[in-house]
Amino acid sequence: MEKQSSRRGLLKNAAKAAVAVTGGAVLASTAKAQAPATLEKKSYPAKPRTDPSAAPPLFSSAVSYGNLVFLAGVGYHESGTIEEATKHVLDELEKNLQSAGSSMEKVLKVNVYLNDIKDWARMNTAYAGRWGQVPPVRTTIAPAGGIPGNSLVEIDLIAYI
């Protein structure tokens, strides 16, 4: 009797595994069928090249791929408060999003880099309310070496178009 029940258990497990594999194959083929035939990567240079002999830019200020847009970090390299710096950075990001055909309401992910983590609460006062009804997910860090260009804050993001 024990051999028979262990065989039944083995057969049940094999049947479950077959269903799982078949279901996975169906899902994979469905996803493949729904994927666009070609996705085009579009880059928006950080600074337009006026001199063709000049070296190419190190990075793009924005890159879109499919219906996603990735914005490079924007900082504020002037003197001022963290609130002023954050407002300026968010205003610049909003302009960049609009140029790419998106908006602050369509932002999915934000990375905030603070020169000093003690500015976190004050940065949040300028940050709040800029994203529509559903704010994006966010990570905030204070890099040990600070932010290049002595900015109080730098923000990059990912949005959809």
Regions found by a protein language model. Give the residues of each.
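N-terminal presequence-like segments and the immediate start of the first folded domain
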Residues: 2-87, 115-161
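Core FKBP-type peptidyl-prolyl cis-trans isomerase
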Residues: 84, 105-107
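Short, well-ordered amphipathic alpha-helical segments that serve as non-catalytic structural scaffolds
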Residues: 84-98
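Phosphate/pyrophosphate-binding loops at sites that engage ATP/ADP/AMP, CoA/4′-phosphopantetheine
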Residues: 97-105
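Acidic helix-start/capping segments at beta-turn-to-alpha-helix junctions
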Residues: 107-116
